[in-house]
């Protein structure tokens, strides 16, 4: 008789081969047809809300691995919260104004842009941005991200621009917005301010000089600075040191020079000066406030300030500060330390009277004269030249300069705004916790916020200038009037309409009372655009109440979106816009290097998706400790395919052995489950509990490790291996088989749900193969989280099994040794003799005597007092070949082989099954 046909072998249509790349597209189409986003929300109608608010990526190119990481993380959170019973809307957004887009458009347009009006350039920018909104939308959807893709928020849309202006109006009304001098890019040949998008970088040969500044207190004590712009020295007012860097005081002749310790060798090598005689080491902060003699004008002084932007890449770690000619110089020198803005250069790039003897000289021509003067004064340490990348004007291709001009600012201290923000920071939950201190220190130290940009592509600042008296006016009434226009026509109206149409009919200059104005053309910093998203989303969407539950972005956003959002929200609404902030690290290559095209180490997420499937990318992310920087390469991604295969095979085995299991008719009550099955069900509860804790703390890599270990070591290598005999050999409807199936069914459903937020495609596929009674919804994404059942955990049983599984490890070692010696082939060829180490273990083995053969997958287990061959911690183990004959059906050895005519060559158990006598 062919006994194989009497076994209950697994049957399933769930394929072994995933074919992810094609299968994922099928599910995407199905989700589209069912209107997945709205369907899932409908299933949570009336449930409590959880709102993760999307930080908008720039619509200036295809998505990269960083944006993919960010969106998948958000998707995991939203899907988990949905399964926990929350109504979790997710509205994606796009940041569509600003430099990155204007820069790309100017590159595409080339020379043509010079003939175009601001309105025409803006139209091109809008087309470019919306094109990439559509591209990125499809790419994000391909990753399996669920969201309201048809109704995103887009910062260039009129209804959003109105909200930007509304938030800005509040700041103006509160008196937080003011106008002041600030250095910006200036082209002396074109005589115009330039936006960053109008800057091109080319190689440029500049002087490279080291200059020593003499202390006012000690004529032999000097700080050595390095600069490539000698022409800015007449505007010098300070010297910046890093507060925490170590600086060496070096004896050179009779003089003492201060140079950053880490740069001493490079300095000596370049200048040929011996710096080996270090007499003292100090921190930058030790010199704060000290006065030094100005290198050009002996009657002026230069004060030491501290700045954390000072680097140890080149120079001396001591930076000459001219707030009139540099952005950092301005922020640290003028805003933080109150140093004066000296900018003795006119619009043609010539020195003014303020520069003394250099008056009338073109700045580049003055470089050589200044170097000679420094040499004559004995303070030029070394001079050479350097070729470096330097900003040039895109119009005339000449080098540009930084020159102080008027700009708009938000005062962060007016109305106690900074203090209010700090108080709100402490009310927010920061994950990881160090995020709180990071953003706190940034807020504590930040200067006033420069919000004006000399760019075309942005939200215009609705300021006007009186033609009669020159007063620049920023008035809430003008902003409000403009907002009404924007609602209908968008912000392009500012660049297209005459000024008379843009201001209220009765509006006059508050200074002179006249009504003759011209438009100012500055635009707002794009961080105000994105920072105002809370106002748009909470006023336009009923399912987004203020404050929002979570913001989730990269850790650079402590300085960016988290920062701008909390300032604007505190100003507008009086509190932080978020309750919880979760941050992730950055993606590096396998060697921990930053990704760059020049290194050739960039991983394109869509390339991964097309080669392996989005599921593998999602699995890679889940495997990563994303709170820190994450490493990726195609090799690292490929490693996940093997993990994926193991997980998939686990589900295939479960589905295959549950094909005939009706969850309503065939379920075995908990109290009737067999011992091993009760243990496995208890273990599942522990897995559910831990997985839930890890998801709640957003530690997805711990979920991944837990599940992978569970699938490979506890299921495949233990429980599922152990119950194969019962599943295949016992009668189809017997308690022995149905007991195992009951627990396997629980494992299947729970494991599917635990993995659904991460493996969104594969768990949908698993769901589609479930018994129809297990499918309550159209999608697994609408299912509820598995319930943790404490009553299913028998603590004594779990403790006993810890010892039994330890003994099992020793048995497996002993079996392997005998396999190597060809004593046995399969483990069922074996009889295992156990020698307990003590009476407690003996009692344990006696208690579970009936399940030991099944647990060890052997034909016989006996206990003995004699010495065993393998010495374990709890037992000694001897393995020998089992006596008797091999059952032709279950392969166990027995001394009672059947001689029945109908069923010859089988063991008593199989004979009973075949006769229908074993239930």
Curated annotation (Swiss-Prot):
Its EC number is 6.1.1.5. Its main location: cytoplasm. PROSITE patterns: AA_TRNA_LIGASE_I. Pfam families: Anticodon_1 (PF08264), tRNA-synt_1 (PF00133), zf-FPG_IleRS (PF06827). One of its GO terms (biological process) is isoleucyl-tRNA aminoacylation. Coiled coil: none annotated. GO terms for cellular component: cytosol. Its cofactor is Zn(2+). It is an enzyme of class 6 (ligase). L-isoleucyl-5'-AMP binds at residue 553. Zn(2+) binds at residues 887, 890, 907, 910. ATP binds at residue 597. It is found in: Cytoplasm. Keywords: Aminoacyl-tRNA synthetase, ATP-binding, Cytoplasm, Ligase, Metal-binding, Nucleotide-binding, Protein biosynthesis, Zinc. InterPro entries: aa-tRNA-synth_I_CS (IPR001412), aa-tRNA-synth_Ia (IPR002300), Anticodon_Ile_BEm (IPR033708), Ile-tRNA-ligase (IPR002301), Ile-tRNA-ligase_type1 (IPR023585), Ile-tRNA_ligase (IPR050081), M/V/L/I-tRNA-synth_anticd-bd (IPR013155), Rossmann-like_a/b/a_fold (IPR014729). Catalyzes the attachment of isoleucine to tRNA(Ile). As IleRS can inadvertently accommodate and process structurally similar amino acids such as valine, to avoid such errors it has two additional distinct tRNA(Ile)-dependent editing activities. One activity is designated as 'pretransfer' editing and involves the hydrolysis of activated Val-AMP. The other activity is designated 'posttransfer' editing and involves deacylation of mischarged Val-tRNA(Ile). IleRS has two distinct active sites: one for aminoacylation and one for editing. The misactivated valine is translocated from the active site to the editing site, which sterically excludes the correctly activated isoleucine. The single editing site contains two valyl binding pockets, one specific for each substrate (Val-AMP or Val-tRNA(Ile)). Monomer. HAMAP family: Ile_tRNA_synth_type1. This is Isoleucine--tRNA ligase.
């Amino acid at each position: 008789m062919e006994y194989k046909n009497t076994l209950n072998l697994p049957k399933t249509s769930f394929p072994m081969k995933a074919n992810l790349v094609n299968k994922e597209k099928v599910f995407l189409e199905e989700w589209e047809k069912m209107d997945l986003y709205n369907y899932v929300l409908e299933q949570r109608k009336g449930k409590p809300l959880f709102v993760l608010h999307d930080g908008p990526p720039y619509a200036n190119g295809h998505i990269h691995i960083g944006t993919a990481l960010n969106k998948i993380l958000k998707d995991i959170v939203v899907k988990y919260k949905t399964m926990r019973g929350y109504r979790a809307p997710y509205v994606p957004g796009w940041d569509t104004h600003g430099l990155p887009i204007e820069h790309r458009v100017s590159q595409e347009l080339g020379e043509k842009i010079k003939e175009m009006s601001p309105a025409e350039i803006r139209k091109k920018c809008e087309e470019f941005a919306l094109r990439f909104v559509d591209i990125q939308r499809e790419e994000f959807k391909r990753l399996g991200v669920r969201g309201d893709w048809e109704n995103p928020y887009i910062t260039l849309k009129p209804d959003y621009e109105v909200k930007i202006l509304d938030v800005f109006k509040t700041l103006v009304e509160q008196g937080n917005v003011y106008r002041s001098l600030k250095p910006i890019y200036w082209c002396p040949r074109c005589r115009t301010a330039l936006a960053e998008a109008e800057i091109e970088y080319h190689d440029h040969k500049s002087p490279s000089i080291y200059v020593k500044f003499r202390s006012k207190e000690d004529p032999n004590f000097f700080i050595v600075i390095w600069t490539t712009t000698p022409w800015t020295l007449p505007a010098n007012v300070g010297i910046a040191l890093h507060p925490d860097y170590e600086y060496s005081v070096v004896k050179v002749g009779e003089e003492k020079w201060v140079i950053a310790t880490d740069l001493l060798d490079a300095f000596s090598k370049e200048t040929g000066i011996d710096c080996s005689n270090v007499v003292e080491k100090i921190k930058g902060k030790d010199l704060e406030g000290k006065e030094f003699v100005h290198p050009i004008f002996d009657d002026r002084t230069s004060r030491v300030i501290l700045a954390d932007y000072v680097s140890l890449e080149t120079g001396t770690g001591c930076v000459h500060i001219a707030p009139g000619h540099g952005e950092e110089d301005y922020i640290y020198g003028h805003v933080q330390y109150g140093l004066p803005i000296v900018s003795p250069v006119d619009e043609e790039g010539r020195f003014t009277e303020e520069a003394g003897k250099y008056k009338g000289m073109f700045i580049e021509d003055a470089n050589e004269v200044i170097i000679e003067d420094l040499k004559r004064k004995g303070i030029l340490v070394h001079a050479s030249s350097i070729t470096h990348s330097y900003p040039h004007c895109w119009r005339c291709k000449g080098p540009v300069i930084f020159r102080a001009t008027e700009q708009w600012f938000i005062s962060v201290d007016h109305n106690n705004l900074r203090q209010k923000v700090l108080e709100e920071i402490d009310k927010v939950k920061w994950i990881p916790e160090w995020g709180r201190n990071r953003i706190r220190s940034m807020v504590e130290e930040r200067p006033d916020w420069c919000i004006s940009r000399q760019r075309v592509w942005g939200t215009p600042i609705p300021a006007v200038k009186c033609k009669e008296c020159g007063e620049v006016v920023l008035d809430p009434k003008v902003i409000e009037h403009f907002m009404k226009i924007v609602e209908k026509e968008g912000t392009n109206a500012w660049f297209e309409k005459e000024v008379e149409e843009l201001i209220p009919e009765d509006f006059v200059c508050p200074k002179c009372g006249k009504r003759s104005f011209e438009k100012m053309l500055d635009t707002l910093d794009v961080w105000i655009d994105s920072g105002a998203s809370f106002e748009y989303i909470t006023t336009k969407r009923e399912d987004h109440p203020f404050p929002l539950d979570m913001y989730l972005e990269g850790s650079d956003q402590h300085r960016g979106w988290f920062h701008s959002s909390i300032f604007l929200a505190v100003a507008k609404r009086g509190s932080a816009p978020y309750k919880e902030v979760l941050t992730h690290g950055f993606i590096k290559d396998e060697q921990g290097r930053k990704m760059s095209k020049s290194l050739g180490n960039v991983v394109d997420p869509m390339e991964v998706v097309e080669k392996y499937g989005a599921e593998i990318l999602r699995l890679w992310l889940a495997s990563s400790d994303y709170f820190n920087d994450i490493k990726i390469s195609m090799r690292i991604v490929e490693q996940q395919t093997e993990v994926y295969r193991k997980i998939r095979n686990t589900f295939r085995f479960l589905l295959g052995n549950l094909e005939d299991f009706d969850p309503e008719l065939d379920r075995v009550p908990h109290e009737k489950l067999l011992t091993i099955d009760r243990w496995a069900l208890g273990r599942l509860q522990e897995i559910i509990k831990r997985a839930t804790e890890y998801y709640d703390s957003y530690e997805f890599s711990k979920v991944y490790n837990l599940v992978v270990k569970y699938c490979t070591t506890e299921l495949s290598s233990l429980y599922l291996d152990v119950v194969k005999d019962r599943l295949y050999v016992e009668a189809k409807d017997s308690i022995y088989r149905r007991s195992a199936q009951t627990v396997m069914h629980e494992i299947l459903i729970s494991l599917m749900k635990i993995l659904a937020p991460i493996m969104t495609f594969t768990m949908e596929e698993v769901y589609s193969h479930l018994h129809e009674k297990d499918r309550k919804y159209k999608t697994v994404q609408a299912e509820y989280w598995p319930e943790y059942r404490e009553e299913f955990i028998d603590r004594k049983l779990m403790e006993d099994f810890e010892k039994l599984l330890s003994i099992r490890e020793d048995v497996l070692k002993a079996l392997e040794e005998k396999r190597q010696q060809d004593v046995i082939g399969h483990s069922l060829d074996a009889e295992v003799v156990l020698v307990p180490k003590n009476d407690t273990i003996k009692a344990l083995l006696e208690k579970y005597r009936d399940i030991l053969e099944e647990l060890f997958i052997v034909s016989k287990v006996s206990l003995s007092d004699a010495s065993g061959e393998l010495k374990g911690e709890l037992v000694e183990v001897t393995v020998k070949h089992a006596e008797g004959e091999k059952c032709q059906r279950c392969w166990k050895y027995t001394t009672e082989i059947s001689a029945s005519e109908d069923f010859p060559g089988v063991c008593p158990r199989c004979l009973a099954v075949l006769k229908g006598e074993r239930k």
